From Swiss-Prot:
The gene is hisG. One of its GO terms (cellular component) is cytoplasm. The lineage of its organism: Bacteria, Pseudomonadati, Pseudomonadota, Gammaproteobacteria, Pseudomonadales. Pfam families: HisG. This is ATP phosphoribosyltransferase. Its main location: cytoplasm. GO terms for biological process: L-histidine biosynthetic process.
Length: 211
């Protein structure tokens, strides 16, 4: 059995056409189904529907053989048991700092609100900047507006939400897209099968990119 971990939303919607190129199609619509384990048209392949931030955990610990996760999630993840063989070039966005329009950055310790705590620590350590990191799980834009933080670090797509709240994108930390991740043990045990799937997905990505 080959198990693939996916998260609902944009990543799932963009991944399903790529999997279809490999003949892997869910037997029911994951967006409408309440099931978290979904069979596919290949009897020995199933999909696990999990939270986006949990995809690397399921794959590293062998609960799934493969998964699709955003690079932002992988940058924040601290595990070691993953291969990242393919950039699927889907769900593209940017990981950026943002702050109030026209605000002057304080010279002392910077207060940064984010759910990407590990990314923030690395980013500011590389700059030699002292920061206090405040972990939030959502509504990041509020933090600078009410004085909780000087800046935020978050995923930015169009930037419309930032602008609607009087914020502006500032420094680019990373360009984000979704990646195929593979469990290291699964890659050894089912190498031919998984490598064939990787090759098929790579061709599908290249074909879509050329198109």
């Amino acid at each position: 059995m080959l198990t693939i971990a996916l998260s609902k939303g944009r990543i799932l919607d963009d991944t399903l056409p790529l999997l279809a190129e490999a003949g892997i199609v869910p037997t029911e619509n994951p967006d409408k189904s309440r099931k978290l384990i979904i069979p596919t048209t290949q009897e020995d392949v199933r999909l696990l529907i999990v939270r986006a931030t949990d995809v690397p955990t399921y794959v590293e610990h062998g609960a799934a053989d493969l998964g699709v996760a955003g690079k932002d999630v992988l940058m924040e993840y601290t595990g070691q048991g993953l291969y990242e063989p393919l950039d699927l070039q889907i769900a593209q966005c940017k990981l950026m700092t943002a702050g109030k329009v026209g605000a002057v950055e304080p010279k002392g310790r910077l207060r940064v609100a984010t759910k990407f705590v590990n990314v923030a620590k690395r980013y500011y350590a590389e700059q030699g900047r002292q920061v206090d990191i405040i972990k939030l799980y959502g509504s990041m834009e509020l933090a600078p507006l009410i004085g909780l933080a000087d800046k935020i670090i978050d995923v930015v797509d169009t930037g419309n939400t930032l602008r609607a709240n009087g914020l502006e994108p500032q420094e680019l930390i990373a360009t984000i897209s979704s990646r195929l991740v593979v469990n290291k043990a699964s890659m050894k045990m089912q190498h031919a099968r998984i490598q064939a799937l990787i090759d098929t997905l790579r061709k599908a990505v290249e074909s879509r990119h050329r198109g």
